[in-house]
Each structure stands twice: as structure tokens, then as C-alpha cells.
């Protein structure tokens, strides 16, 4: 089945429908991801030394989409790549599949989510990939602040907030507070139904894609 939409593939198609690849990557064919899972630990160590890894308990790497002569590939870069990639982890089995499925369930519940998909490594193992929403197509930064920043909590206290505190923060900083509070409540109910016990302060953000600050589409959703 297609790793993006979960629908059946036609004969000769591999991993993605051409339309799904175009929708997510902007290319007719799936970009090459020429890394094996066994190489990722060493690569992660290199990027940590270079301070190019992204924050969070789940391993994350930043990827850039490079297009050359009709062939496109995803390469590990610094912090500001086009995509965020999460590989398999020994601590939690099939975590990429869990996250992608939960994001699909959220979409089915009419919750706005960031663009996301599964993608296959060179050795056949699956990883989770999501498109960054804090960058414009020209690479210019979009203002985005998570609830740790907005409530002045250091990252190590990301589990110390409350839903009441987050709701008050949305009311204070959002330019569309009533709409965002309604969307936030819908997301909370979804997390309760799916058993998500990891909705900490860094998993909720406000951003300014145009003139106004608003709640971002949902991201980092799990059923654990």
C-alpha cells in the first residue's frame, strides 16, 4: 500500500502513488533516502557533535530535498532542512508507524495536522517524515513559538504545564482565540480517546503564517 495515503498501489508502483509523491515531495518520483538504519546511530552522533539534531526524546534528523538532473534525494543537513525524519528506535517498537497512523486518525477526525508520511530507508525499514511548517518555500523563517517558550518553561519542565495554562496562553497570544480554543479542545478529546500520554508543552505551538498568530496544525501525535 501507499506509505502516504495507505491506499492500494497499482502494478509497477512502489511505496507511493505518483500523485502522493508529488503532493508531499513536489516530485513525481519518491526522492532517494540512501541511508540504512544501522548507519543512523553514527550519523546521529555526528550531527549531535555538530549541534544539528532536533530536540525531543524521539530521535530526529533534519533532511533537505535536493533535486539534480531529474533525480531527487533526501540528505541529512543542519537544523533548518525541509523535512524532519524520525527513524525506528529500540525503546519503542514501530514508533514511526504509530505516529503516522495516529496522524491519519486525527485527519479522519477532521483535525488539521502537519504534512506527514512514512518513508522507506535503503535497507527497507520504515521511518516517519514530516514537512516543516516554520519555513516558507523560499526558506524564510515563519515565526513559531511552542508552549514551553510562551509559558516561560525551560525544556526540561515541558511536562509541568496544565491544559488550563495552555488555554489561557492561547487566549492571550492568539489572534483567533475562540477558534483556536475550540480546535485545542477537539485535539484534547482526540488525545484522550487515542490514549496519548505525551502531549507536553513542546507539542503545542502558535505560529504566524501570514499576519496573525494562530494554533499550528497538530504534530507529534502518538497513541501510547
Residue ranges of predicted features:
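Conserved ATP-binding subdomain of kinase catalytic cores across diverse folds
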Residues: 39-158
Amino acid at each position: 500500500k501507499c506509505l502516504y495515503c495507505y491506499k492500494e498501489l497499482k502494478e509497477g508502483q512502489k511505496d507511493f502513488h505518483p500523485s502522493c509523491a508529488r503532493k508531499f515531495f513536489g516530485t513525481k518520483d519518491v526522492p532517494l533516502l540512501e541511508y540504512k538504519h544501522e548507519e543512523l546511530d553514527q550519523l546521529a552522533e555526528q550531527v549531535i557533535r555538530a549541534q544539528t539534531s532536533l530536540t525531543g526524546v524521539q530521535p530526529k534528523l533534519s533532511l533537505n530535498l535536493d533535486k539534480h538532473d531529474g533525480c531527487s534525494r533526501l540528505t541529512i543537513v543542519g537544523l533548518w532542512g525541509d523535512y524532519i525524519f524520525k527513524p525506528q528506535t529500540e525503546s519503542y517498537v514501530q514508533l514511526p508507524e504509530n505516529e503516522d497512523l495516529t496522524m491519519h486518525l486525527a485527519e479522519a477526525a477532521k483535525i488539521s495536522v502537519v504534512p506527514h508520511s512514512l518513508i522507506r530507508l535503503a535497507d527497507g525499514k520504515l521511518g516517519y517524515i514530516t514537512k516543516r511548517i516554520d519555513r516558507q518555500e523560499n526558506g524564510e523563517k515563519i515565526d513559531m513559538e511552542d508552549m514551553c517558550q510562551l509559558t516561560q518553561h525551560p525544556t526540561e519542565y515541558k511536562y509541568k504545564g496544565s491544559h488550563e495554562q495552555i488555554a489561557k496562553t492561547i487566549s492571550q497570544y492568539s489572534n483567533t482565540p475562540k477558534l483556536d480554543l475550540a480546535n485545542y479542545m477537539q485535539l484534547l478529546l482526540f488525545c484522550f480517546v487515542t490514549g496519548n500520554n505525551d502531549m507536553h508543552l513542546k507539542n503545542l505551538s502558535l505560529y504566524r503564517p501570514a499576519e496573525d498568530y494562530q494554533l499550528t496544525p497538530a504534530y507529534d501525535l502518538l497513541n501510547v
